[in-house]
Amino acid sequence: MGDVEKGKKIFVQRCAQCHSAQANLKHKTGPNLNGLFGRQTGQASGYVYTDANKAKGITWQADTLDVYLENPKKYIPGTKMVFAGLKKANERADLIAYLKQATNL
Protein backbone atom coordinates (compact mmCIF):
# COMPACT_ATOMS: atom_id res chain seq x y z
CA MET A 1 0.00 0.00 0.00
CA GLY A 2 1.28 3.44 -0.89
CA ASP A 3 1.81 6.61 1.11
CA VAL A 4 -0.97 9.15 0.49
CA GLU A 5 1.16 12.21 1.34
CA LYS A 6 3.98 11.13 -0.97
CA GLY A 7 1.37 10.44 -3.63
CA LYS A 8 -0.05 13.94 -3.23
CA LYS A 9 3.40 15.41 -3.85
CA ILE A 10 3.77 13.29 -6.99
CA PHE A 11 0.32 14.39 -8.18
CA VAL A 12 1.13 18.07 -7.64
CA GLN A 13 4.51 17.77 -9.36
CA ARG A 14 3.65 15.43 -12.22
CA CYS A 15 -0.13 15.40 -12.79
CA ALA A 16 -1.86 18.57 -11.58
CA GLN A 17 -0.78 20.66 -14.56
CA CYS A 18 -3.12 18.58 -16.75
CA HIS A 19 -5.55 16.93 -14.28
CA SER A 20 -7.75 17.93 -11.37
CA ALA A 21 -9.04 15.42 -8.84
CA GLN A 22 -11.77 17.23 -6.93
CA ALA A 23 -15.46 17.13 -7.82
CA ASN A 24 -16.98 20.06 -9.69
CA LEU A 25 -13.71 21.26 -11.24
CA LYS A 26 -13.49 21.59 -15.00
CA HIS A 27 -11.39 19.38 -17.20
CA LYS A 28 -7.93 20.71 -17.97
CA THR A 29 -5.73 19.40 -20.78
CA GLY A 30 -6.55 15.99 -19.33
CA PRO A 31 -9.82 14.86 -17.76
CA ASN A 32 -10.89 15.56 -14.20
CA LEU A 33 -10.06 12.38 -12.28
CA ASN A 34 -12.86 12.61 -9.73
CA GLY A 35 -14.71 9.28 -9.62
CA LEU A 36 -11.83 7.55 -11.43
CA PHE A 37 -11.97 4.21 -9.60
CA GLY A 38 -14.61 1.97 -11.09
CA ARG A 39 -14.98 4.07 -14.25
CA GLN A 40 -14.13 2.69 -17.69
CA THR A 41 -11.48 4.29 -19.88
CA GLY A 42 -12.70 7.22 -21.92
CA GLN A 43 -15.82 7.84 -19.84
CA ALA A 44 -15.37 11.13 -17.93
CA SER A 45 -18.43 13.15 -18.89
CA GLY A 46 -17.69 16.18 -21.03
CA TYR A 47 -14.10 15.27 -21.91
CA VAL A 48 -13.12 14.47 -25.51
CA TYR A 49 -11.04 11.28 -25.53
CA THR A 50 -9.08 9.64 -28.32
CA ASP A 51 -10.67 6.61 -29.95
CA ALA A 52 -7.89 4.52 -28.37
CA ASN A 53 -8.95 5.53 -24.86
CA LYS A 54 -12.62 4.94 -25.57
CA ALA A 55 -11.93 1.54 -27.13
CA LYS A 56 -9.59 0.19 -24.41
CA GLY A 57 -12.59 -0.91 -22.37
CA ILE A 58 -10.94 -1.54 -19.02
CA THR A 59 -12.15 -0.32 -15.65
CA TRP A 60 -9.80 1.85 -13.61
CA GLN A 61 -8.73 0.05 -10.44
CA ALA A 62 -5.41 -0.03 -8.57
CA ASP A 63 -4.02 -2.83 -10.74
CA THR A 64 -4.98 -1.27 -14.08
CA LEU A 65 -3.70 2.14 -12.98
CA ASP A 66 -0.41 0.59 -11.91
CA VAL A 67 0.21 -0.84 -15.39
CA TYR A 68 -1.01 2.34 -17.10
CA LEU A 69 1.06 4.71 -14.97
CA GLU A 70 4.23 2.75 -15.67
CA ASN A 71 3.96 3.46 -19.41
CA PRO A 72 0.72 5.09 -20.60
CA LYS A 73 1.54 4.98 -24.32
CA LYS A 74 2.36 1.27 -24.15
CA TYR A 75 -0.84 0.41 -22.25
CA ILE A 76 -3.09 2.54 -24.45
CA PRO A 77 -1.37 3.11 -27.81
CA GLY A 78 -2.84 6.26 -29.31
CA THR A 79 -3.53 8.04 -26.01
CA LYS A 80 -2.89 11.77 -26.11
CA MET A 81 -1.45 11.75 -22.60
CA VAL A 82 2.11 13.08 -22.86
CA PHE A 83 3.21 11.78 -19.44
CA ALA A 84 6.08 9.32 -19.90
CA GLY A 85 5.17 7.27 -16.83
CA LEU A 86 6.46 6.40 -13.38
CA LYS A 87 9.04 3.63 -13.55
CA LYS A 88 9.35 3.11 -9.77
CA ALA A 89 6.69 0.79 -8.33
CA ASN A 90 6.70 2.58 -4.97
CA GLU A 91 5.96 5.93 -6.64
CA ARG A 92 3.06 4.39 -8.55
CA ALA A 93 1.73 2.87 -5.31
CA ASP A 94 1.97 6.26 -3.58
CA LEU A 95 0.18 8.04 -6.43
CA ILE A 96 -2.55 5.39 -6.56
CA ALA A 97 -3.06 5.66 -2.78
CA TYR A 98 -3.49 9.42 -3.15
CA LEU A 99 -5.83 9.06 -6.13
CA LYS A 100 -8.00 6.57 -4.23
CA GLN A 101 -8.48 9.15 -1.50
CA ALA A 102 -8.62 12.35 -3.56
CA THR A 103 -10.89 11.19 -6.38
CA ASN A 104 -13.57 9.58 -4.25
CA LEU A 105 -14.53 12.57 -2.10
Swiss-Prot record:
It holds the Pfam family Cytochrom_C. Signal peptide: none annotated. Gene3D superfamilies: Cytochrome c-like domain. It is found in: Mitochondrion intermembrane space. One of its GO terms (molecular function) is electron transfer activity. InterPro entries: Cyt_c-like_dom, Cyt_c-like_dom_sf, Cyt_c_1A/1B. Keywords: Electron transport, Heme, Iron, Metal-binding, Mitochondrion, Respiratory chain, Transport. Heme c binds at C15, C18, H19, M81. One of its GO terms (cellular component) is mitochondrial intermembrane space. Belongs to the cytochrome c family. Electron carrier protein. The oxidized form of the cytochrome c heme group can accept an electron from the heme group of the cytochrome c1 subunit of cytochrome reductase. Cytochrome c then transfers this electron to the cytochrome oxidase complex, the final protein carrier in the mitochondrial electron-transport chain. This is Cytochrome c. It comes from Macrobrachium malcolmsonii.
